[in-house]
Regions:
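Glycine/proline-rich, flexible active-site/cofactor-binding loop segments
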Residues: 1-24, 85-92
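A generic secondary-structure signal for well-formed alpha-helical elements
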Residues: 3-7, 72, 76-80, 157-161
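Polymerase palm active-site segment centered on the conserved acidic dipeptide of motif C
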Residues: 128-131, 138-215
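Conserved polymerase palm-domain catalytic core
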Residues: 32-133, 137-152, 172, 223-242, ...
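Beta-rich nucleic-acid/ligand-interaction surfaces
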Residues: 13-29, 137-140, 171-177
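Hydrophobic recognition helices of helix-based DNA-binding modules
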Residues: 3-4, 120, 186
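Active-site and adjacent loop segments of nucleotide-processing enzymes
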Residues: 183-279
């Protein structure tokens, strides 16, 4: 089983734009690739051009087993490993779909759209394109027809039995903000790429901070756990250009708890005071 997983990983590692659950990759990798692609485009074309955003419906539940087996036959040259891979896929009945959250499934679905990736990069000669699992971006130069390119990409995806979500797929001029994987990207007139985190995350973070106060008062949460939770939320926004959001959340925390969330010593001192009071 381990050898099979390593084979899947080796088969997918070369598709560097497919950032998901591989060592050194993930959403941070995908964000960095998109920023680099936007800067590369800006140095040559300014803000002229468009970005195509594509999302697939039911990416895991609807994947074709037949198409996966074709990939196995091409990439897994060891027949024993190929049989193990086929058997893993066949654990899902009906000829379609793979389970979420299972490592072999993740490896399969990282590599599965590679034919589409190669089509975009090689046959369509698009320099700036990438994806995070089923979320694709394709940056189209101003001398190319974005609608035509999108139609070709959709046709290629459908040949792999992938269903494009028409409601989530669109063409956006680079002069306007766009969302990719729930993050907002803005290419400014100076070529700077501004990234903002998911705005709904701010509302959730505010609710959680207020709820943590009740948990602390009821003894359901320690100050060490509070430190971990709050700074995890702040770290998410600190990874974006969301300085003002971070400041507002820190101010809310101070108004609720009466101390700054920036130093772990503040949490430990408050925890010791509570222990003394309880004793």
């Amino acid at each position: 089983n381990t050898e099979c997983q390593l084979s899947f990983a080796d088969a997918t590692r070369k598709y560097i734009e497919a950032g998901k659950d591989l060592e050194g990759k993930g959403f941070e990798f995908s964000k960095r690739m998109l920023k680099e692609d936007l800067r590369w485009h800006f140095r040559r074309y300014g803000r002229d051009g468009n970005v195509i955003l594509i999302d697939f419906k039911q990416f895991f539940p609807s994947v074709s087993h037949e198409e996966i087996f074709k990939r196995h036959e091409k990439l897994l040259l060891n027949p024993d490993i190929r049989k193990i891979g086929d058997d893993v896929v066949n654990t899902v009945s009906g000829g379609v779909g793979l389970p979420l959250g299972v490592e072999p499934s993740q490896a399969e679905m990282i590599a599965f759209p590679s034919a589409l990736d190669n089509f975009i990069k090689c046959q369509l000669s698009i320099k700036c394109a990438g994806h995070y699992m089923d979320d694709y971006y394709v940056i189209v130069p101003p001398d190319r027809d974005a609608k035509e390119i999108m139609a070709l990409i959709v046709a290629k995806a459908e040949s792999l039995k992938l269903t494009v979500s028409k409601s989530k797929s669109r063409i956006v001029p680079l002069t306007k903000p766009f969302r990719y994987c729930k993050a907002k990207f803005i290419l400014t007139e100076t070529g700077r790429v501004v990234m903002n985190g998911n705005r709904d995350g701010v509302k959730r973070a505010r609710r959680k901070i207020k709820a943590f106060r009740t948990k602390i008062q009821n003894g359901e949460m320690s100050y060490d756990d509070l430190w971990t939770s709050v700074n995890g939320m702040l770290a998410y926004f600190e990874s974006y250009d969301d300085h003002n959001r971070v400041l507002r959340l820190r101010r809310l925390f101070y108004s609720v708890f009466g101390f700054s969330p920036e130093r772990i010593e503040n949490f430990r001192e408050r925890g010791k005071k509570d222990e003394i009071c309880c004793a």
